[in-house]
């Protein structure tokens, strides 16, 4: 564009120079014509003036010739300048085309660079979004890992606690098993004593059937026997209540160590009550033996009274046997429940007790091996004098 502007300026300048030369030549030619015309019109022009005029004309001719030469030179120069201008114009146009092509190429390059930049910017933004998403996933994974580690620690603590509780439970199970074995031995002894008591009562019935005591003495003996029977029944009822209490306490769920200790104490207390009931039964049997002796001393009853007394004694003995049989069934059932409890796995702490199931063993409990054995009573039969 600059080259084009300069070329146009040169062309304008050359045009102005050519126009000036042409106007100057025309002015000089006009002056010569005017002088000749003036001479021709004035016939009185002096010779000197004419000569001067001729010289001037010659001079003007020379000048005109020189001006023509200059004009040709100027025209040639102008033509050269025009050629140069055309050449410069062509070069400028070529350069302009080249520049335009260069500018188009530059524009295309800039467009390509802009496109690449936009593409890279989009890729960078996509990578940033992807990185943010990955970071979010990573944060979520870290949170999940932390939660799992916390859960693992909690489970490890729970397993450790369960392991300790299992050790305590195993120790308490062993202790309670020993106590249960001792309790079974005690129940066997109770059953044996009850069997002896039944045999003694049968013997008393036989002795009463053959006694010839007097009515008054027999009535006293009968009242005493009934009282003794009531005491025995009371003792058996206490024994039944204590055994029921033991069963109910066995049905309590896997409780704490203190609860198991209380249950064990209650079982021991029940055993003491059983021993006490046996002692009372022994004392009542001793009273019956004393009554039998008194019956032997008084033999004044009639056959009818003997039959009535025998019927009453048989009825009472039958009722007592039924009660003893029922008590034996309950003891057998209790033994079966305890045997099944010893085979079942320990319940977890905090669960409710299921009826009919035994309690979990208590840690630290000791078997009743050091307890004093049940007092073995010796009784002498009044009829034969045999000691049992």
Curated annotation (Swiss-Prot):
Its main location: secreted. Residues 1-29 form the signal peptide. Binds to human plasminogen (and plasmin) via its kringle repeats. Also binds to albumin, immunoglobulin G and fibrinogen. Could provide the bacteria with a mechanism for invasion, as streptococcal-bound plasmin could permit tissue penetration. This is Plasminogen-binding group A streptococcal M-like protein PAM. Residues 385-388 form a propeptide. The keyword Secreted applies. The modification Pentaglycyl murein peptidoglycan amidated threonine is found at residue 384. Belongs to the M protein family. A- repeats lie at residues 91-103, 104-116. One of its GO terms (biological process) is plasminogen activation. A motif (LPXTG sorting signal) lies at residues 381-385. Residues 95-189, 204-231, 248-269, 331-388 are annotated as: Disordered. It is found in: Secreted, Cell wall. B- repeats lie at residues 147-153, 154-159. The lineage of its organism: Bacteria, Bacillati, Bacillota, Bacilli, Lactobacillales. D repeats lie at residues 311-316, 317-322, 325-330, 332-337. InterPro entries: Plasminogen_ligand_VEK-30, SMCR, SMDRR, YSIRK_signal_dom. Residues 147-161 are annotated as: 2 X tandem repeats, type b. GO terms for cellular component: extracellular region. Residues 85-113 are annotated as: Able to bind plasminogen. PAM has more than one binding site for plasminogen; it is thought that each of the a-repeats can bind one plasminogen molecule. Residues 95-137, 145-168, 176-189, 218-231, 260-269, 331-340 have a biased composition (Basic and acidic residues). Residues 91-116 are annotated as: 2 X approximate tandem repeats, type a.
């Amino acid at each position: 564009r600059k080259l084009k502007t300069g070329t146009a300026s040169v062309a304008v300048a050359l045009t102005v120079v050519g126009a000036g030369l042409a106007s100057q030549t025309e002015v000089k030619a006009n002056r010569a014509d005017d002088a000749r015309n003036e001479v021709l019109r004035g016939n009185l022009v002096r010779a000197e003036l004419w000569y001067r005029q001729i010289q001037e004309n010659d001079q003007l001719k020379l000048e005109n010739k020189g001006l023509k030469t200059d004009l040709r030179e100027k025209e040639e120069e102008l033509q050269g300048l025009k050629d140069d201008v055309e050449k410069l114009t062509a070069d400028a146009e070529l350069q302009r085309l080249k520049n335009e092509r260069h500018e188009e190429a530059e524009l295309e390059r800039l467009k390509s660079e802009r496109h690449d930049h936009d593409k890279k910017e989009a890729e960078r933004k996509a990578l940033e979004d992807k990185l943010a998403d990955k970071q979010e996933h990573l944060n979520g994974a870290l949170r999940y890992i932390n939660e799992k580690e916390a859960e693992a620690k909690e489970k490890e603590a729970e397993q450790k606690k369960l392991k300790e509780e299992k050790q305590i439970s195993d120790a308490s199970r062993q202790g309670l098993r020993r106590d249960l074995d001792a309790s079974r031995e005690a129940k066997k002894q109770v059953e044996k004593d009850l069997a002896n008591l039944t045999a003694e009562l049968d013997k008393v019935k036989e002795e009463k059937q053959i006694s010839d005591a007097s009515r008054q003495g027999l009535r006293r003996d009968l009242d005493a026997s009934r009282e003794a029977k009531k005491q025995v029944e009371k003792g058996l009822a206490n024994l039944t209540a204590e055994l029921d209490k033991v069963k109910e306490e066995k049905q309590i769920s896997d409780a704490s160590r203190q609860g198991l200790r209380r249950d064990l104490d209650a079982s021991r207390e029940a055993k003491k009550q059983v021993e006490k009931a046996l002692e009372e039964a022994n004392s009542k049997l001793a009273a019956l033996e004393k009554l039998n002796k008194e019956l032997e001393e008084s033999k004044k009853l009639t056959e009818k009274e003997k039959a009535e007394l025998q019927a009453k004694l048989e009825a009472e003995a039958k009722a007592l046997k039924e009660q003893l049989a029922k008590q034996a069934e309950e003891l057998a059932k209790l033994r079966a429940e305890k045997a099944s409890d010893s085979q079942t796995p320990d319940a977890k702490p905090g669960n409710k007790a299921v009826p009919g199931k035994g309690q979990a063993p208590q840690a630290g409990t000791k078997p009743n091996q050091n307890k004093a054995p049940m007092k073995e009573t010796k009784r002498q039969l009044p009829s034969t004098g045999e000691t049992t």
